[in-house]
Structure formats: structure tokens, C-alpha cells
């Protein structure tokens, strides 16, 4: 029997959640060989990258371009702040590497289009982190495909996080400064509620929306034609101060007359 290939993976920043490179490292056919980031990133970025590289006994190099050219990689794992996802993924694709990236794909639609073009142009694969293969989702898909629940006409997903997001809405006293988004996210890293890590504030629809939207797309197998969404800030002072949502509802019209809806939010201890 031919020996299975081991794929060499480079981690392009690992400053947010590190579950993505850890998942890759846990697979027997993947090997993490290097962590890389751009030299002009702030100190906290380099510190987190170095800590992860040290844990896995691999080098941390402050030169993404050099690593892409010189380390004989098969794929890149992108786990930076959301606003840098597309830039790093495009650079990896242009270097001929397959890409596994953390969500969201980007905070801007134009950047998503650029990434899709780069993937197609270079004939590489792109995988965005998702939860489509959780047991409950698989069971739902089997029930739909088997006809056990009849013909699908409508689908709804509730997706809420109970992770905290700092002080509750309304707790900031007169004269207190607004909560700084990046500082709050850096503090939240310890308990895993830093999904919006980055300079640019992000609401929950941006941070977590891929999950329920991914479920709907997978379970229906059809495209969305019309969307109506509404966002609000009900729970967390950091979201109020930075003008981003912590609760959202979305209504969808899909092909074949199917309608979809989702509710999503980070409700903390509410």
C-alpha cells in the first residue's frame, strides 16, 4: 500500500482562537511546521504567535512572504484577527497553497470576492471553519434527505452564546470612558469570548453568523434569493459603546419557495 502523504501546514498568525491550528495538528496526516506573521504587527500579536510556536516546538518567523516562499508548505492555516483573514489567505493562495481559515471570511464583501478570485485563479482549495458536521446537524440532514419529516418548506435556527462579553448594558457610569473594543477582546482571550478580536469592532452577526447560515445552506441545498436582517444591542456595554450588535434576526427567501430564519446573539448571563 502506498504511504499516505503528510501535508505541511504553516500557521499565518494565531492571535485569536487557536482551535483551528490545533485541529489541524491533531490530524495524523498534517504537520505544523512554522508560525508566521508580518513584522509590522504590534507586540501582543508577536507574543501570542511566539507562545503558540513554542508550545509546538516550531519556529516563529516575522516574515509571511518569506515563509510562503521558503518552507515547502502544502497549506496555510489562517487564524488572525478577522480584518486580516482575507489578506493572509489571498497571499497564501497566490503562493499556491491550499487555505483553511477561521471565520468570518472577511468583514467586507469586496474582500471575499478578492479571495474567491485568488482561489480560482490559483486552482487551490479553500475551507472556512464551520460546524456543519456536528452530530445534531448530521442527524437533521439525514432526516431531511430520507424524507422522514416530509417535504422541506421552512427552516429556523436559534444560535446563542452564553459566553460573557464584559459588563452588562447600562453599567457604565456618567464620566466613565467607553469600553475600548480591542482592550476588552484581549482581556477576553482567557475565557474564550474574544471572537471579535481586532481593531475593528464586530457584531455577533458578523462574528458567528456563518454557523446558522451554514446550517441552512447545507440542510436545504439551495441558494438564498432575498434577505432581511435586523440587529440590536440588548445585553453588553462593550457592544453599546462600539455600536455593534449582540442580537440579530434574519429572514431568508430561498430557491424552491423555501423560507428560512435565524436568531443569533451573545447573551452572556442574561
Predicted feature residues:
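Beta-loop-alpha module in the N-terminal Rossmann-like domain of NAD(P)-dependent dehydrogenases
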Residues: 56-118
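N-terminal Rossmann-like dinucleotide-binding module
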Residues: 1-55
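NAD(P)-dinucleotide binding in Rossmann-like oxidoreductases
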Residues: 231-234, 238-270
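Rossmann-fold dehydrogenase core element
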Residues: 114-131, 151-155
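Hydrophobic residues in well-ordered beta-strands that form the structural core
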Residues: 62, 101, 126-128, 156, ...
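Short, Asp-centered acidic motifs that coordinate Mg2+ and/or phosphate
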Residues: 34, 74-75, 154
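Predominantly a Rossmann-like dinucleotide-binding segment in NAD(P)-dependent oxidoreductases
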Residues: 15, 134-230, 234-240
Amino acid at each position: 500500500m502506498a504511504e499516505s502523504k503528510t501535508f505541511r501546514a504553516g500557521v499565518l498568525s494565531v492571535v485569536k482562537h487557536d482551535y483551528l491550528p490545533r485541529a489541524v495538528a491533531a490530524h495524523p496526516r498534517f504537520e505544523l511546521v512554522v508560525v508566521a506573521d508580518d513584522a509590522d504587527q504590534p507586540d501582543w500579536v508577536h507574543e501570542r504567535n511566539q507562545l503558540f510556536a513554542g508550545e509546538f516546538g516550531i519556529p516563529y518567523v516575522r516574515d509571511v512572504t518569506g515563509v510562503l516562499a521558503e518552507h515547502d508548505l502544502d497549506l496555510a492555516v489562517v487564524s488572525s484577527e478577522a480584518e486580516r483573514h482575507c489578506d493572509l489567505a489571498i497571499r497564501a493562495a497566490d503562493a499556491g497553497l491550499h487555505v483553511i481559515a477561521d471565520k468570518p471570511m472577511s468583514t467586507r464583501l469586496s474582500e471575499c470576492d478578492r479571495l474567491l478570485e485568488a482561489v480560482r485563479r490559483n486552482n487551490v482549495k479553500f475551507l472556512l471553519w464551520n460546524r456543519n458536521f456536528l452530530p445534531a446537524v448530521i442527524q437533521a440532514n439525514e432526516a431531511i434527505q430520507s424524507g422522514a419529516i416530509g417535504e422541506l418548506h421552512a427552516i429556523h435556527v436559534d444560535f446563542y452564546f452564553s459566553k460573557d462579553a464584559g459588563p452588562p448594558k447600562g453599567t457604565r457610569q456618567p464620566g466613565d470612558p467607553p469600553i475600548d473594543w480591542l482592550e476588552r477582546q484581549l482581556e477576553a482571550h482567557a475565557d474564550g469570548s474574544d471572537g471579535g478580536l481586532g481593531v475593528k469592532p464586530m457584531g455577533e452577526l458578523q462574528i458567528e453568523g456563518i454557523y446558522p447560515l451554514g446550517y441552512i445552506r447545507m440542510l436545504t441545498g439551495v441558494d438564498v434569493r432575498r434577505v432581511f436582517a435586523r440587529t440590536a444591542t440588548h445585553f453588553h456595554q462593550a457592544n453599546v459603546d462600539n455600536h455593534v450588535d449582540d442580537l440579530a434576526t434574519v429572514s431568508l427567501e430561498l430557491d424552491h419557495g423555501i423560507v428560512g430564519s435565524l436568531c443569533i446573539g451573545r447573551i452572556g448571563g442574561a
